[in-house]
Amino acid sequence: KAASTRDKDFIEHVYVATNHQYMLFFTEQGRCFWMRVYEIPEGSRQSKGRAIQNLINLPQDDKVLAFINVLNLKDEDYINNHHIVMCTKKGVIKKTSLEAYSRPRVNGINAITIREGDTLLEAKLTNGEQDIMLAVRSGKAIRFPETKVRSMGRSASGVRAITVDHENDEVVGMIVVKEGDGFDVMVVSEAGYGKRSSLEDYRITNRGGKGVKTITVTEKTGELVSLKAVTDDDDLMIITKKGTMIRMGVNTLRVMGRATQGVRLINLRKGDEIASIAKVPASEEEEELLDAEGNVI
């Protein structure tokens, strides 16, 4: 056991880092904050950690949604050959050289100009040679080389990554992938259906298109809520809006065709739907299904 958690909480990210490496925190409103690893209070294996809001100068109306561990912000070769790629819920993507984030400021900086009615969704570290994949609620996904996104300054708002079908459609996830890296594509719908498909099923296209079908969205499946890059060494933590939580191994899911409906991952109570999906390191423990009070079902 690496840490204790509060009720309804679980460990989602685990980083191996030295004291002098940096953690970059990206917020919903498009700001970036820094912390040296040694500035994070050290705890025991049993401690529950500290709330991020107590460690960085985060406004009350903003929240952290992406974390990036950076090896060395003083290595010119490293910072000039890596990028931060961000996407918003409305399908805007932006790439900025890591060098632009190499001068930490206590109060953070603007990482992307967010347009009205939009919010930041994801931020990833890339090496300039990877592919970007996004999926939207209507069940479409697009894959394109990151070279199709030119590097921009921090004040820029970005360019179109995917064209959504209607104004209520939005991006649900972004992954950074490359052929041969061993990852499969995992999508989950709001009614608890999921599907693991091969990355090879998604042809590389140009940025800005409508994408291809990644899951057949029906009244039974509900709209798409999650996109993850997974391997057999991952677990999925599935959380519903009424408080049910289930953990399941990706290795229990077979690879299926891109346009299929998928399989039911969880039986939902009437009126319940999936709230969020997290990819976590595989557990050797048996999976447990918990109700809203935290009792094993």
Predicted segments with their positions:
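Short, structured "edge-of-domain" segments at secondary-structure transitions
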Residues: 1-297
